[in-house]
Amino acid sequence: ALQYKGVDWSSVMVEERAGVRYKNVNGQEKPLEYILAENGVNMVRQRVWVNPWDGNYNLDYNIQLARRAKAAGLGLYINFHYSDTWADPAHQTTPAGWPSDINNLAWKLYNYTLDSMNRFADAGIQVDIVSIGNEITQGLLWPLGKTNNWYNIARLLHSAAWGVKDSRLNPKPKIMVHLDNGWNWDTQNWWYTNVLSQGPFEMSDFDMMGVSFYPFYSASATLDSLRRSLNNMVSRWGKEVAVVETNWPTSCPYPRYQFPADVRNVPFSAAGQTQYIQSVANVVSSVSKGVGLFYWEPAWIHNANLGSSCADNTMFTPSGQALSSLSVFHRI
């Protein structure tokens, strides 16, 4: 069984304010954290934005949400975006008002990370995992942290890591680096080889390598490619690895890209979600230091496509009732 069986539930309070009431598979209304826990989830992932215009996903929002997770006995994985909005391979916008020279930016990043971690510590909330950036394959805190300057990236990541290490959290969270396209070993190898050869960012600065692995953006995203990539990562660097974002659709009438050949027989349904998540979990489990799987935003029913060309990737009906697939976490 995987050590971390998780769900990103960042948007739950946004949905609740919009009137959503979550129900388990039997139609019984409960707070989402208890529905997740009774379905085998043991950790939640939460994204943190620095200063979003509406306050959603900021630090206060996240501390409120984390209290609920802890009350339900769930572990906590904090996913820093280091931006006021979405950060991913196409967007890594430095927060408004942050410094525009690398020395001051590195200090700002250290202090922001330190202060944020101390807020959790002071609230009595244990953080289990922290990712220092989200899908930073093309760098972070642009333009200074773009991949045309690997040394800057290494400096920034070192500063972020030590913001976690110097915090009052005890025990210390595991520190994760998170890239996209986990199936692509060439990408992972290119990125880590460059960043770790610079000097400032050292192997001792972090504990885990996280990857996103989605079926609907490339036919190359096969389970075999994921297995090969994760195995190579572990044999080269020896870190724990996890799939920290994945989805499977219940509806995908107009896919923009071809699905990988090895999952084309998996149906677009709750049963298909169960089958796919079990398959991905089996790959992670087969890797010597494969420790976890996290499903991305299964309860964000007002954004059901979850950014993809598939109509619905959630694990809930439009009225907020859990699908049978949510119980897959008992079996991975």
From Swiss-Prot:
What EC designation does it have? Answer: 3.2.1.89
Enzymatic class:
hydrolase
Location of the active site? 135 (proton donor), 245 (nucleophile)
Q: Which GO terms describe its molecular function?
A: arabinogalactan endo-1,4-beta-galactosidase activity; glucosidase activity; hydrolase activity, hydrolyzing O-glycosyl compounds; polysaccharide binding
Q: Which reaction does it catalyse?
A: The enzyme specifically hydrolyzes (1->4)-beta-D-galactosidic linkages in type I arabinogalactans
Q: Which residues are glycosylated?
A: 111
Q: Which family does it belong to?
A: Belongs to the glycosyl hydrolase 53 family.
Single GO biological process annotation from the record: pectin catabolic process
Q: Which organism is it from?
A: Humicola insolens
One Pfam family for this entry, by name? Glyco_hydro_53
Key words, A-Z:
Glycoprotein, Glycosidase, Hydrolase
Q: What else is known?
A: Has a pH range of 6.5-9.5 with optimum of 8.5; and a temperature optimum of 65 degrees Celsius at pH 6.5.
The protein in question is named Arabinogalactan endo-beta-1,4-galactanase
Secretion signal, residue range per the UniProt entry: none
Gene3D superfamilies cross-referenced by the UniProt entry: Glycosidases (3.20.20.80)
Record flagged with keyword Hydrolase: yes
Question: Which InterPro entries does the UniProt entry name for this protein?
Answer: Glyco_hydro_53 (IPR011683), Glycoside_hydrolase_SF (IPR017853)
Q: Which PANTHER family match?
A: ARABINOGALACTAN ENDO-BETA-1,4-GALACTANASE A (PTHR34983:SF1)
